[in-house]
Amino acid sequence: MSRTGFIQSKVGGLPRPFWVLFGGTFVNRLGTMVEPFIGIYLTQARGVSLATTGLVMTMFGLGSLLSQPVAGWLTDRLGRRITLTGGMVATAVTMIVLGYTTSVPGLVVGMLVLGIVVDAYRPASQAIVADLVSPEDRPRAFGLLFWAINLGFSVAMVAGGWLAHSGFTVLFWVDAVTCLIFGLLVWRAIPETRPAREDAQPGRFADVLRDRLMLAFVVGNLVYSLVYLQGYTTLPLAMTGQGLPTSAYGMAMAVNGLLIVVVQPLTNAWLARFDSSRVLAAGFALVGVGFAVTSLASSAAGHAAAVAVWTLGEVLTAGIPGAIVAALAPPHLRGRYSGLYGLSWSAGTLLAPLVGTRLLAAAPGLVWPLFGAFGLLAAVGQLLIGRAIRRRSAQTA
């Protein structure tokens, strides 16, 4: 295959508005500097206790939990473009206000609001891709967005740590500006893709909840999220508990970012040739295996190797859930279906640290094999509903 043909297989055939969304997503993630450092900001810059910091972080998770169904409803009701742009503008304003808030009640309320608005763009973004991209190209398109998110976030982690030395307020302003750029790009360059009113059917969130196949998919993803998110919640605690320095966790997670940035674009188009449910199940299983072998790791290199295993599983899952949701959702309910899917991640974000840290304290020898079993359970569940997903996809293609 020629170089041109190779590049065409990876990025060709996608409409211009998709690339605007891709670029805006990348810019937005370049500025994602507040969330990763919010715990350090609260304890060091604002002098907040660890207990209060935990409360503030919980409010952020609660806000995210509330935002997904609401944003999904707005996406279908008002439109994709206005929901995404409105969410970005609201996030920018909240970031700036939060950066100058000093009282604990203000921080609690501010983080709740931030949790509501910061990810409100997700259902709209997913619906735009579903509206614009053909079913056969959706796994590739969602995979490219996944790559943009991870590449931007990797840069933001490094840049945010450096900029924080100049004062944490800078992080809030950078985050706000990149949110505004994303919102402006969408408003100016992406047309509204929601089905015309005369073509759209009436629909309610209750209609989504009656879709047993979608509910089964969401429950399986929730189980998977409980496993995957341990890499960001319980794993650093387990490593420091083994006497490893904080830098060891940073090195292990650098392996995660490097593998995603390098491997995922190379495999994205190739994986799209296979059945989505089987690839997703393989990814769930490999993530489970990666966390299970964490129980064998006692050094920085050992943990980095375990992270490499579950990162390869993460690469397998890139883009596929969004494509499955798009295939399951009727056009007039795409926002709400995407919101329900996002709800599984928001719930996982709340539950993962609670479950993981308690297991680590009560049964440190069982925590990683148990999460490995959860990953395999999610894989089996995905295989069980795979035939029904294929049948529904064929009907909606």
Give the positions of each predicted feature:
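Helix-to-loop junctions at the C-terminal end of transmembrane segments
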Residues: S67-G79, V263-S276, L360
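Cytoplasmic helix-loop-helix junction between adjacent transmembrane helices
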Residues: G110-I149
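Juxtamembrane intracellular "pre-TM" segments in multi-pass secondary transporters
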Residues: M1-P15, P191-G220
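Helix-loop boundary and gating motifs at the non-cytosolic
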Residues: R16-G61, L215-A252
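Residue-level signature of mid-helix packing/kink "hotspots" within the transmembrane helices
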Residues: M33, G61-P69, F153-S154, G257-P265, ...
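Structural signature of the two symmetry-related core transmembrane helices
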Residues: I82-I96, R278-V293
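C-terminal membrane-cytosol helix-exit motif in multi-pass small-molecule transporters
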Residues: V177-A196, G381-G386
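Conserved MFS/SLC helix-loop-helix module at the cytosolic interface between two early adjacent transmembrane helices
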Residues: L66-T102
